[in-house]
Amino acid sequence: MRQKEVLAKSFQGPAAVCRTPNSHVYMFNNGSGDSGDSSEEESHQVVLRPRGKEHQKNSSQRPGAGTMVLLQRELAQEDSLNKLALQYGCKVADIKKANNFIREQDLYALKSIKIPVRNHGILTETHQELMPLGASSSETRVTLVDLPEDEDAGGATTQGNQLTDFFKGIDENIERAVHSDVFHGDSCCVEAPDQLLLPITQKPVADGADCGIQWWNAVFLMLLIGIVLPVFYLVYFKIQATGEPSNGLNATVVPNGSMTLSPVPGQAPRLAIPVPTLPASDSQVSPTTQAGA
């Protein structure tokens, strides 16, 4: 039991050290160097952070409390957390904390938003600086609400006239660029005014090994060259081979029974040879005569 109590006590260092030529003397607060006999124990102080109304009362009593105020205004269609943070010189995390935002998309579910700014500053003293840019500036309403200063929140940077004008100029440039006619087209081309525009060269129709013809034209040409022309070629030479005469004479039968040979060019004319004609009665032979013969 004694050992547990000794272990529970914290070590207490010497309050002073006296050096002598032969030794060192350590002086403690209770006059003894034994840590087990020390009756003092280290106390750990835990500071609890108050919340709710008690936190507001304590924060109002501290010096510097009430230096932050909430600026409440109606939201426009083009507003975003980044734009509001740049415009009013605060942090996006402070805006989320003041409006209990979990995500940035929660902004579009509200009609008005609270923005933390410094009290007695340029943004709170001048109403013109509180109005947003664009057409929705006339509908802006400003309400000042006391914001208790948080211990963890750091001090916001001081807002000057030059910084305000700088962000105001950025917003004006963005607004002008959105409503300009340059971005209404499908593509945006920025060129120098004195730059000469080269004529557009039309792509040739013939491309590749087929010279740009259609597929059915290619099939027709292949059929014509591979089938039709060879058939005509064979028919022509067949006709030429069968049309040549076998002899150099042309025989003509004359009705009177003689045959006349017409002269052929390059040969001597010949006489006509008479051919005897038999009467019709002699040409018929009776069966009895043929049997007797």
Swiss-Prot record:
Membrane-topology annotation of the record: Single-pass membrane protein
Matching InterPro entries: LYSM1-4, LysM_dom, LysM_dom_sf
Pfam families: LysM
Residue numbers spanned by region Disordered: 28-65
SMART domains, per database record: LysM
Primary location class: membrane
Domain of life, source organism: Eukaryota
Protein known as: LysM and putative peptidoglycan-binding domain-containing protein 4
Protein's organism: Mus musculus
Gene that encodes the chain: Lysmd4
